[in-house]
A protein has these predicted regions:
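N-terminal Rossmann-like dinucleotide-binding module
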Residues: 1-61, 340
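C-terminal helix-rich "cap/oligomerization" subdomain common to oxidoreductases
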Residues: 1-13, 81-83, 228, 300-341
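Contiguous beta-strand/loop segments that form the cofactor/metal-binding neighborhood of enzyme cores
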Residues: 2-7, 194-266, 293, 299-309, ...
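Beta-loop-alpha module in the N-terminal Rossmann-like domain of NAD(P)-dependent dehydrogenases
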Residues: 61-124
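Hydrophobic residues in well-ordered beta-strands that form the structural core
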Residues: 67, 107-108, 132-134, 163, ...
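Rossmann-fold dehydrogenase core element
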Residues: 120-138, 157-164
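Predominantly a Rossmann-like dinucleotide-binding segment in NAD(P)-dependent oxidoreductases
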Residues: 138-209, 214
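Active-site loop of classical SDR/Rossmann-like NAD(P)-dependent oxidoreductases
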Residues: 285-299, 315
Length: 341
């Protein structure tokens, strides 16, 4: 089987939006660096609640303006779109602020702790006529399009079983273990949850066991998802153990394996189902590697703005809400309450 080349958007073909950055921390640093290296998108302004942080960020990335407040940032007439990269607990507060100022908004994943809050926010943004998009960047990567083409061409059969791991010993990253961060399921686990949805759709049943910390934060989860059509997914999510972060699909005719780590620009193999997994491998050999892959979503975002869209066809509002319902169910079943409830 010859594996297809990805159908990717030329970043030079879309409008160069002027971006305002809310939450100029580490993930925003990665995002802005990536879009400046690989796209025509430009961050032009920022603000921060932490003294000096916005000034340092602006100096690093060559931003034109630093505002004294987030309210002033979203009101800036020379900003077209807002990128929200604060703690999860603040995502919707600032996303709503951007929408109410008439700005399109890209919000870091996960959008919220709460599926119902996300649903309400998306309805508000749609009514306002602006694009609101969760930054589930994996959906926009070349490897994801290679998989889409295989599905569209009927090359790999019907998915029967999906397995994915995101397990990395992150006990040293303090923010992952606080309610403001959302916990391991919401911060790390949202990747395998969303990838399962990408491949299998939304589940009809969710079964989870796991471990929580003395403070009630989730540390490790073992998740089985069942689907109305009889297939199932198995997810392992951990902030204490380290295993390869791969994703594998067993179909009626083949096995598809996404390389480690499956959520960045990487490769995939399509194999037969014998013991030795004979088949073909596709590798992403572009210059956009690692977390520079965050840049792809920005180009698609700009394209959707130019088309007048209020939702992303590759990762819809309904997709975000469905994934948050799974994350909520996992936390409830293992006794973790990352929102502090």
């Amino acid at each position: 089987m010859a594996l297809p080349a990805p159908r990717m958007l030329d970043p030079r073909s879309v409008p160069a939006l002027r971006w305002g950055i809310i939450g100029p921390g580490s993930i925003a640093d990665t995002f802005v660096g990536a879009i400046h290296r690989h796209t025509t998108q430009r961050a032009v302004a920022t603000a921060s609640r932490t003294a000096g942080q916005a000034d340092a960020f602006a100096k690093t990335h060559g931003l034109e303006r630093v505002h004294e407040s987030y309210e002033a940032l979203v009101a800036d007439p020379e900003v077209d779109a807002i990128y929200v990269a604060t703690h999860i607990s603040d995502h919707l507060t600032y996303a709503r602020m951007a929408v109410d100022a008439g700005k399109h908004v890209l919000v870091e994943k996960p959008l919220s702790y709460s599926a119902s809050d996300a649903e309400e926010f998306f309805a508000h943004a749609t009514a306002a006529g602006v694009l609101a998009m969760e930054a589930m960047w994996t959906r926009y990567l070349p490897v994801s399009d290679v998989y889409r083409q295989l599905v569209e061409a009927g090359e790999i059969g019907t998915p029967e079983f999906f397995q994915a791991n995101f397990a990395n010993d992150n006990r040293h990253i303090e923010r992952l273990w606080t309610p403001a961060s959302g916990g391991i399921v919401h911060d790390m686990g949202i990747y395998p949850i969303a990838f399962a949805q990408f491949v299998m759709g939304n589940p009809s049943a969710i079964h989870a066991t796991g471990r929580v910390t003395a403070e009630g934060m989730d540390a490790e989860s073992y998740v089985t998802l069942e689907y109305d059509y009889g297939s199932r997914s198995l997810l392992y999510i951990s902030g204490t153990a380290t295993v390869p972060c791969t994703a594998t699909i067993s179909t009626s005719t083949n096995m598809v394996t996404f390389d480690h780590p499956f959520f960045v620009p990487t490769g995939l193999s399509v194999s037969n189902k014998d013991l030795y997994f004979t088949g073909e491998h596709w590798a992403d050999t572009t210059a956009v590697q690692g977390h520079d892959g965050l840049s792809y979503q920005a180009s698609y975002f700009a394209q959707y703005v130019s088309e007048g869209r209020t939702d992303s066809p590759l990762h819809s509002h309904a997709d975000t809400v469905g994934n948050l319902r799974v994350a909520e169910a996992i936390c409830e079943q293992i006794g973790a309450y990352p929102s502090g409830q």
